[in-house]
């Protein structure tokens, strides 16, 4: 496969979800108009917020929207409700799957493989789970995946819990899975930090998709 150009953004500050979601949509629209435009990768952290997929069940929110003290967004992705917050590393991929494989199941499995390699770089053993999307350590979920796709151009991506307040997941039924336990990477490797994880995420995505990155 020939190398493909991708713009990559890796902000050090905590980013507002809605700003980054709008940015993804702009890059998706640009690729739909002209597939010679670059793909786009964003790696960073969000303020505390909750997002729901297209067909999400609001019963999986364990708080009243009218009294919510945090932002809640319904967005163009599959899957149920999840939580974003500082200490969790989020990666968004706006890719033209026509350059890779026009198969969403292949793409989901590819993302799971990428996450497993990322955690493996820190000597953390993890696995996918039949019948579910995401990555697990034993019976605890450490990474969530949610993607949207329009004309084979993807948006959204995956989140990995590094060192975040897992109590925030208690306000929802994570990914619609009853009694779902969550985990942080720091619980399995005390020596890592989010900047080092970010570096490994960039490296593995570059290798897996044969990207030439342009930093912004």
From Swiss-Prot:
Record-annotated site: Lowers pKa of active site Cys: 141
Main location: cytoplasm
Cellular location(s): Cytoplasm
Any one Gene Ontology BP term: protein modification process
Top-level enzyme category: transferase
Residues covered by the BPL/LPL catalytic domain: 35-213
Catalytic site: 175 (acyl-thioester intermediate)
GO cellular component: cytoplasm
InterPro entries according to UniProt: aa-tRNA-synth_II/BPL/LPL (IPR045864), BPL_LPL_catalytic (IPR004143), Octanoyltransferase (IPR000544), Octanoyltransferase_CS (IPR020605)
Described function: Catalyzes the transfer of endogenously produced octanoic acid from octanoyl-acyl-carrier-protein onto the lipoyl domains of lipoate-dependent enzymes. Lipoyl-ACP can also act as a substrate although octanoyl-ACP is likely to be the physiological substrate.
Record-given protein name: Octanoyltransferase
Biological source species: Prochlorococcus marinus (strain AS9601)
Gene name of the record: lipB
